[in-house]
Swiss-Prot record:
BP GO annotations: L-leucine biosynthetic process
Enzyme Commission number: 4.2.1.33
UniProt protein name: 3-isopropylmalate dehydratase small subunit 2
Protein source organism: Mannheimia succiniciproducens (strain KCTC 0769BP / MBEL55E)
Task of the protein: Catalyzes the isomerization between 2-isopropylmalate and 3-isopropylmalate, via the formation of 2-isopropylmaleate.
Presence of the UniProt keyword Repeat in the record: no
Pathway stated in the Swiss-Prot or TrEMBL entry: Amino-acid biosynthesis; L-leucine biosynthesis; L-leucine from 3-methyl-2-oxobutanoate: step 2/4
Amino acid sequence: MAGLKQHSGLVVPLDAANVDTDAIIPKQFLQAITRVGFGKHLFHEWRYLDAEETQPNPEFVLNFPQYQGASILLARKNLGCGSSREHAPWALADYGFKVMIAPSFADIFYNNSLNNHMLPIKLSEQEVEEIFQWVWANPGKKIDVDLEAKTVTVGEKVYHFDLDEFRRHCLLEGLDNIGLTLQHEDAIAAYESKIPAFLR
């Protein structure tokens, strides 16, 4: 898995607070247990005018022409509240989002996002409001995220964010739980070699 060190991308300004996981990916799409294929159902109830997903809602921000190809989601507080479905970050990642910026995230959603190699950035409500205003005023322009420096650069302004160092290390190095285990492969093999044959 590739590491996430710096990222430059378009921002979708989702001007809503308390966006729950059912809005992100409704329950009727949760049958699959693989991580791919959910992006087309992302924000289903808001994004489409029909259940068959053939009529995009022209009033929903994800369908606006200037935000096509966006990889950064900007939202208000408590993003990802509701049920703990891991399909929510799967859908966001499958759509193409790599970074999310909000004043706060639901705890389980926050951890699930990190586990799925997406970067959830917490900034103050005032900072998030400033970014909303900039994005609305500058359609089509990208912002820059630097995980090594823990900064978000929006126009001429630089915002600083915090992230647990262990989580930061995993994102920088592209490590999931399996990758973390493999970092200790030699130590595991050495330990296993000491186990009596009849216990192996």
